[in-house]
Amino acid sequence: MMPLPPQVPRRGGRISRRVAAALLRLLGWHVAGSVPDVAKCVVVAVPHTSNFDGLYVLPALLALDLKMSIFGKKSLFAVPGLAAFLRWAGVMPLDRARAGGVVDEAVAAFHRSKQLFLGISPEGTRHAAPKWKSGYWRIARGAGVPVLPVAIDYGRREVRFLPLFTPTADMAADHAALAALFRGIEPKHKHRLSWPLREAQMAETD
């Protein structure tokens, strides 16, 4: 398994790393590409067409010892015994009633953190999203951090880290440019592929 660069946030779990690496091998999957040497970024993992996607992404992250955070309902942290596990898993509490919503919460989290890899889904669903949501782009622009594209490729049976993407002031162009990085990636369910990714795949065959 590839070593992580010095700036990347780590979990620091030797046992979980070994168990996850063994599980990944058992599943017949592997990690490809390189994790960039940055302390902060928005992580975009696509295509997301099945609940099985997490079965491969989670052990890949654990095997690397990479700590990636996501948002979860704040109310979950009030459940006895659950808060400690959620924090270990990288889940950060999100107060949906707070003005500004997810974007402002995420930007604030980046500003107060020395290290943060924050996972955001641009598709927002497993069922053929007609367009990508703008949250990942607005968070990256607001926090001044790059986007790390991660491909879930069932054809090659790999979780692949792609080159960093720096968002510009043109959101529509950025959506298209980012989707183009995933050309040739095979999802679990092709009929559920989001339309930006379908358009990128069709452009490849033209």
Predicted regions and their residues:
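Soluble catalytic domains of membrane acyltransferases
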Residues: 4-9, 25-184, 197-202
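C-terminal domain-closing interface element
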Residues: 190-206
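S-adenosyl-L-methionine
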Residues: 187
